[in-house]
């Protein structure tokens, strides 16, 4: 019986060890020196277990073998979980565009069949091709080919006609535009109700990068959205991009530059079906992540290699899983109700934050004279705190909770093999990354002689926007170039050496 038990134990250990090695090689995250160490460790265990069974030390050998089997199983479970998370992060790159058919909230209609005799309209300025496709579906479902879709180019005219409810009784619009219109027309999203929704999915058409991330500089676009449900589907949906960070990374010098562009920046964006016009940067996200990427590439004259979409609401669980983070605040402030139901107070300098505090820190803007500019800097500071904690040895003791949290808040087109290369780079080197930050500056005042901004893509007039300074954009371009060229420097020290004349500082792009 003892011999049979020993043989069964040996078979079990060989099977688990084989699965462990398979997972390790499949993940490809361990540098060569660690692979050699793992194989040597397993070989020694089996040699000791084999030889000790013929000696008086076989009991000690069995005890050690059981302990080592536990270690092997633990490592196998870790590697399996990491493999599962990486596969989840690399879901097919699909954008989901939702089109709504809306009527007034107090309308008696409760289904599409009730709209057979309604007058439909849409805003041709802000809509993509899916809106007309959705209306074709409406006509088909109602079996009324004679239905017409009235065209409006101005939201002022369309909303006025809709509220009057004579010439327009139903609007066909992209779901992502509801919040945009509500920002200009108070409570628009609560004054309407959705009768029908249509979903249209398409593959993201971002060009694949061939950069060698172990040796060559590369650029990642970080897009932050707010989704209360935290579902994977929300990350793939077209939505406003509240956080827009360009991360320039040089693996040779271990430097990262995070450049924040304010969400309300009035710049030329890529809109529906590739159309371009001056609008808010955040609105580009309504037309897919590739529209935001194209917008920032044109603004800075760069090629973005990869993107990461983050559910900022989900950052709560990630920060908590990390055991909290340290955020270095530029200013002292207390956040208001819009940012958090709890009035968290932050001091100038380091602040130890849990998940709720970190999100509140990132959301607040009304407490600052600089408004959206300071919020952008705060968001960058929070991401810097997450990166510093995530690349520290402390994460090893919290791997399970971190992996669980990360899997539901990130969506990326970074290939698993590239992520493996980055992990191997960090494991083989071990040195800390030097994370630098820079935020685009600007003004909310329009240029002399110009009236309120007109948003050419979304068709809104008089919106509150940010006019970026041309010199601030140029400085960001210089900093990105320095990182890519391998220069090792401190951003604050470099900026203090730049002399900017008053006219140049106030020129707008």
PLM regions: where:
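Non-catalytic, solvent-exposed segments at the cell envelope interface
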Residues: 89-90, 94-95, 103-105, 111-113, ...
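Internal/C-terminal transmembrane anchor helices
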Residues: 58-80
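Membrane-helix interface "capping/anchor" motifs
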Residues: 51-59
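Single conserved hydrophobic/aromatic residue that forms the stacking wall/gate
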Residues: 1-8, 12, 498-509
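Membrane-embedded alpha-helical segments of integral membrane proteins
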Residues: 9-50
